[in-house]
Each structure stands twice: as structure tokens, then as C-alpha cells.
């Protein structure tokens, strides 16, 4: 993996509040190497280490994107949902930003069946077929389509399991993380001071509550993915 310069600025991270952790009573002792201080009852993350692991993650996704790998971004917290969707769309990644349905990856055949149903319903709606059905049947199928759009809309073009999964909040997305571990799918995980840094392939210590912090981390990662995709297109 070639190391590159990703314009990761400590001052920019401080302005985004990346360094603010959870209260000192809500911490995981395994995070001790990533904590630099305690201040007013909260842990402060060591931003030098954050920059190091964020840079490593950017290198990884650049290399993966440059050979055509596929990414999934998972972040279902309400405050992060829009940022997850916009970042994923910008980098042409799949995303889950409403709810991780249990077995979404470990029971891929079921997910695939749901996706086929979703695509069929979308096609029927675009063709105006739903409007030609009896009102009761049309209403039922439209509700079904709305439900599928909410939970599968971000992965509607997926045809197989992702090559790398980016997880925005370890505790919130623990089910998704465990499924990735079960399947051996590499993960990049944003971890706060109450998380376990040993669960993901690359853990980025950072504030997972502040939207500015989440956006900064996401922007760096998707910029690296976009650069990698450009490299892939040039080499095709």
C-alpha cells in the first residue's frame, strides 16, 4: 500500500471537534493509547493518531478504488444520515443510512431477493403499471415500494457483497460490523472513546457524535475513493 499525502490538518480537525470523546465514565480501556488527556469530565482523543489512521484508511480506499473495488458506507444515526448519503453518492458507493436490517450481508440471498423485488416494483411504477391496478392493490404495492426505498434505496445497485465497508459509529452499527467480521469483509470504522479499536481492520479514533467531525472524516475518505476511481478509469 503506497502512502500518499491527504491534506489532513490537525487544526481543521480541532475546529470540527474531532478530538472530543465521551465522558470519562463511559470509556473503553482499550482506547487508552488513543486518548491524550481528560478535560472537564471528557476524554480528549490524540489527533496525531487520528491523522495517522485516517491517512492509512485513505491509502487503503484509494488503492482499492484504483482497481475497481466496491464500497459500502454504513451510518444510520439520524444526524449523520444525510451526510452518509451525500458522501456515498459523490463517490459512487453503496450506503445504508436508515437501518441495518439484520442479515443484510450474512444472509445475502434474502437481501438479493428483496433487491430484485425492489427493482421490479420501481420498473412497474415508472411504466405506470401500478396506476392501472385496483386501488387497494396499488396502495399496498406503493407502501411496499416506499418501505424498500427507505431501507434498500442506498444499495439498489448492489449485485454482490462489498469489498470494503466504512462504518460511521461502531456501537450504533455493531450488527453490521459483526456481519463483516463473520464474512471477512475488511472494515474501516470511526471509533469514539467508548469503542473497541481492535474490531475493525482500520479504526479511526474520532468524535462520532458531532456532525462536523463525521463530515470531515467522510470527506477525506470519499475524496480518496474519487481519486482512486479516476485512476482506475484512466488505466482502463
UniProtKB/Swiss-Prot annotation:
This is Small ribosomal subunit protein uS2c. One of its GO terms (biological process) is translation. The keyword Ribosomal protein applies. One of its GO terms (molecular function) is structural constituent of ribosome. Keywords: Chloroplast, Plastid, Ribonucleoprotein, Ribosomal protein. InterPro entries: Ribosomal_uS2, Ribosomal_uS2_bac/mit/plastid, Ribosomal_uS2_CS, Ribosomal_uS2_flav_dom_sf. It holds the Pfam family Ribosomal_S2. It is found in: Plastid, Chloroplast. GO terms for cellular component: chloroplast; mitochondrial small ribosomal subunit. Belongs to the universal ribosomal protein uS2 family. It comes from Calycanthus floridus var. glaucus.
Amino acid at each position: 500500500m503506497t502512502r500518499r499525502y491527504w491534506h489532513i490538518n490537525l487544526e481543521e480537525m480541532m475546529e470540527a471537534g474531532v478530538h472530543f470523546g465521551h465522558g470519562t465514565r463511559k470509556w473503553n480501556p482499550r482506547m487508552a493509547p488513543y486518548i491524550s488527556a481528560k478535560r472537564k469530565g471528557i476524554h480528549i482523543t490524540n489527533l496525531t493518531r487520528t491523522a495517522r489512521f485516517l491517512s492509512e484508511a485513505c491509502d487503503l480506499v484509494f488503492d482499492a478504488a484504483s482497481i475497481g473495488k466496491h464500497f459500502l458506507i454504513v451510518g444510520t444515526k439520524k444526524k449523520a444520515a444525510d451526510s452518509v448519503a451525500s458522501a456515498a453518492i459523490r463517490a459512487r458507493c453503496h450506503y445504508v443510512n436508515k437501518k441495518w436490517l439484520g442479515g443484510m450481508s450474512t444472509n445475502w440471498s434474502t437481501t438479493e431477493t428483496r433487491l430484485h423485488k425492489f427493482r421490479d416494483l420501481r420498473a412497474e411504477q415508472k411504466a405506470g403499471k401500478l396506476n392501472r391496478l385496483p386501488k387497494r392493490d396499488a396502495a399496498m404495492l406503493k407502501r411496499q415500494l416506499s418501505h424498500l426505498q427507505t431501507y434498500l434505496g442506498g444499495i439498489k445497485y448492489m449485485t454482490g457483497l462489498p469489498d470494503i465497508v466504512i462504518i460511521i459509529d461502531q456501537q450504533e452499527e455493531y450488527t453490521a460490523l459483526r456481519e463483516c467480521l463473520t464474512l471477512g469483509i475488511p472494515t474501516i470504522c470511526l471509533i469514539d472513546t467508548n469503542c473497541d479499536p481492535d474490531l475493525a481492520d482500520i479504526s479511526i479514533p474520532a468524535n462520532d457524535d458531532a456532525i462536523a467531525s463525521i463530515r470531515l472524516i467522510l470527506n477525506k475518505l470519499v475524496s480518496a475513493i474519487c481519486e482512486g476511481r479516476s485512476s482506475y478509469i484512466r488505466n482502463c
